[in-house]
Amino acid sequence: MFPGVDGFHWSLTHIVFLTLFGLVLSTVLTTVGLALWRTRRAFHTNQAEALCWEADFEDLPASARACRHALTGSAPGRICKNAFDCRDCGQHAQFAAKEVGLEDSGERYGLDYPATRRYDRGHTWVEKHADRTLTVGLDDLGERLAGHVDSVEMPPVGAHVATRGLAWTMKRDGRVMRVRAPIDGIVVETGGPDKGWYLRILPDTQPADLGHLLSGVEVSAWLRAELERLQILLSPASTGASLADGGALEPDLPGSQPHADWSRVCPAMFLEP
């Protein structure tokens, strides 16, 4: 059926066949080429990190993958199977219904976590504004983990950030801390440590769906678990009372505990990409 093969003779049938074969082959090659190009482009953006998040999530210790409802006691021992995206969880609504009416103790262990904000497990917060934009910042524990950074690298205005992809990076003492984005959207303004927030984002969907972020009674339960996790990560460098039971947190943790392995502690706490 192909030129060059013994017994091949040109005919109308051969011409039609080869034309169709060429069109199919061209379509396949074009499709594969586009897929490779898109994949290559994605790996040069934070989209690649967002796509890799599910694999990264499975590598986290079980203590870091606890379901938000396990923390509140509604689903004891449950490990999250949706990489912290409760919007895709078929049981989230069921467990959330059990928590209706639960009173928030308000316990924040000496940390500042305003009720007007939603909180991400990677230690960022999100706050809504009347103009439909969202501001994103480091939560109080995140700020203390970072301490006095040497520099911050922000995405340019107009850049797109993807949930669990890279939001911004901070450098200190030769270490690079990578902060995950808590929401999908376009960066419309950048801030920094001196402004108390880092990104202003126009979310991809309106109204913004923040169902995967923590609020209310969940925040105190999660904070206790995070402080216990931090205590373990800092041992044996840490001394004094348990962080979740009255131990004071310095505003600059790396500065107050210089002998701790911060190149291990910060990536673990920030769920780094």
Annotate each PLM feature:
Residues F2-P273:
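Contiguous, well-folded functional domains in the mature portion of proteins
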